[in-house]
């Protein structure tokens, strides 16, 4: 297979998406005053669905994130309620694709947690998770929900392992142990039968997740891969990374033959990470650079030249990360085909950016809104773990978004276990895993000691009072 070097010049061709343009929301429709995390981990720190926006925030003594109803735009108060149950920095958050108020988070405290957000949003700080999942020995950097199966969650840790969790029982059911360094990115194909990963060991892998077997592997020496995404049903992968000349680069791969990339294209000489986003409905690819304000977009086809440049959205405000609205949350009346939620750290701002196809008619445009994966799962955890693959359940966007009422998350009931040694419950008193957790435990113990000392002092005073009263009674028996 020969490698085709693509020109930087845009290649125009007949396309219904050649005039797509980006439109940033007005300031009153943005989310302002948010203390966005300063963590340098290469994640988006943002997740969005048709009802809520979640953003990882800067906090001391543990990790936290905000969950804001989408209609609550404008300035967010500093004391706005947070989800703050983690003992370490939160590194990734993802909404359940089938249940709008269930969100997963992972943290430096080695745990993965599942949270249930009330329908109207948070009224007070949430510290108790619906589920706490412990299985990694080091920090957990990534979480991903299975695209077609309810209650199957993947987590990748700095222990080089990927754990597959069945949330029906709250336990890990599979472990993928083929990586030799930190996992940078995970992506599923359409039916979730394949998982692709990028890793710090400079390898791109295609994995059968249930068995953990590596089907294809590429040793990317000339194209150091950072991010990867499956391109729908095309049997193609697209990676972003860095070339041997330290320029930002993308590469297109055949998922069944990773010996060489089909094409490579150099983007620019900037140093920020390139985030790829693929829309299988329109076959459009979006490339957004971390630390710059530009979003390039292309159209992908199964025939040469495979990748056709369309346009670029430019903004002077640099982005730290980007959340993406699911298809069923888009405004079809405005011919919106994609929507980003851009994190601008310097301004404490979350800015929605809509990608719009210009059309004169106000009627529903069926040619740009085909049937799309909806909010109903195609499989149960037992079916998927048993080897069944099934395409997503499709929905039409013509009727607009309707909240799913069929899928309900039920946390497994766990019997509390105890191991008592010398009167101490060892499972109740778990040793701290991080320095932040140790400090929190230390200050908590100091407060407890101070409180007990005050109680003891009050009891000493009361005891002396009673002793005096008793002495008086003995000295004056007539007063009895």
From Swiss-Prot:
It is found in: Cytoplasm, Cytoskeleton. Binds to F-actin and to vinculin. The keyword Coiled coil applies. This is Coronin-2B. Gene3D superfamilies: YVTN repeat-like/Quinoprotein amine dehydrogenase. Keywords: Actin-binding, Coiled coil, Cytoplasm, Cytoskeleton, Repeat, WD repeat. Residues 436-479 form a coiled coil. GO terms for cellular component: cytoplasm; focal adhesion; stress fiber. InterPro entries: Coronin (IPR015505), DUF1899 (IPR015048), WD40/YVTN_repeat-like_dom_sf (IPR015943), WD40_repeat_CS (IPR019775), WD40_repeat_dom_sf (IPR036322), WD40_rpt (IPR001680). WD repeats lie at residues 85-125, 135-177, 179-217, 220-263, 265-308. May play a role in the reorganization of neuronal actin structure. Its main location: cytoplasm. The gene is Coro2b.
